[in-house]
């Protein structure tokens, strides 16, 4: 698994709307890396990227 590059999104007010799905180590498909980072910070989790694309 690959840790998401959350640092590059930390200054943004929200996530970009581009659809570039990643599969998290929790088995969920996220629309993009930023959404995974946002979910991690909101829910105090440490989900990583299992693979690019849908799960």
From Swiss-Prot:
Segment forming the signal sequence: none
InterPro entries: Kazal_dom, Kazal_dom_sf, Prot_inh_Kazal-m
Annotated positions for site Reactive bond: 17-18
Keyword match Disulfide bond: yes
Pfam family, one: Kazal_1
Cysteines joined through disulfide linkages: 6-37, 15-34, 23-55
Boundaries of every Kazal-like domain copy: 1-55
GO cellular component terms, A-Z: extracellular space
Gene3D superfamilies assigned: 3.30.60.30
GO molecular function: serine-type endopeptidase inhibitor activity
Record's function text: Inhibits trypsin and plasmin.
Protein's UniProt name: Trypsin inhibitor ClTI-1
Organism this protein belongs to: Gallus gallus
């Amino acid at each position: 698994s690959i840790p998401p590059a959350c640092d590059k999104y930390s200054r943004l007010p929200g996530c970009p709307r581009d659809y570039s799905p990643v599969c998290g180590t929790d088995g969920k498909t996220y629309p993009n890396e930023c959404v995974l980072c946002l979910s991690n910070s909101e829910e105090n989790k440490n989900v990583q990227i299992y693979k690019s694309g849908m799960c």
